[in-house]
From Swiss-Prot:
Physiological role: Protease subunit of a proteasome-like degradation complex believed to be a general protein degrading machinery.
Record's keyword terms, sorted: Allosteric enzyme, Cytoplasm, Hydrolase, Metal-binding, Protease, Sodium, Threonine protease
Pfam families: Proteasome
Name of this chain's protein: ATP-dependent protease subunit HslV
Species in which this protein is naturally found: Campylobacter jejuni subsp. doylei (strain ATCC BAA-1458 / RM4099 / 269.97)
PANTHER family: ATP-DEPENDENT PROTEASE SUBUNIT HSLV, METALLOPROTEASE TLDD
Amino acid sequence: MFHATTILAYKGKNKSVIGGDGQVSFGNTVLKGNAIKIRKLNNGKVLAGFAGSTADAFNLFDMFENLLQSSKGDLLKAAIDFSKEWRKDKYLRKLEAMMLVLDRNHIFLLSGTGDVVEPEDGQIAAIGSGGNYALSAARALAKHANLDEEELVKSSLQIAGEICIYTNTNIKTYVIEDEK
């Protein structure tokens, strides 16, 4: 498991949201508390976030963004092509990072081994050291609270930040709303 972050993605009825905390840790030391580990891709139609080695994650972001462009914004095709490229490249197989990517139709976890996983419920996924805390909170809030999608993500990450020592409560979110 990667120590240093928590990323949570939620594909709700009206919005898709990704959020992340701002903490960067090196061993037992907090280096930075306001890092941004999420991005908008494909003119804001795809959201992505990473956990793991920052340098590795930037390489993965660039590679994924290129595949997303070559697939004309088709997230499913880009995720599959990403996995194929990852498996073929010996250098990529050694990268220590994970990504969450989502749009209004799909949500995928791209693992450090080149796997592409769509969550069983198709709605909520989390990565990073506080990922399981955020995932648990998000599932409970989705089931029992009447929160807007962005508030659900923020509240879940807040809970993770209060529990996980590698996660803080400096939360940043990006949202994709249904076109009206």
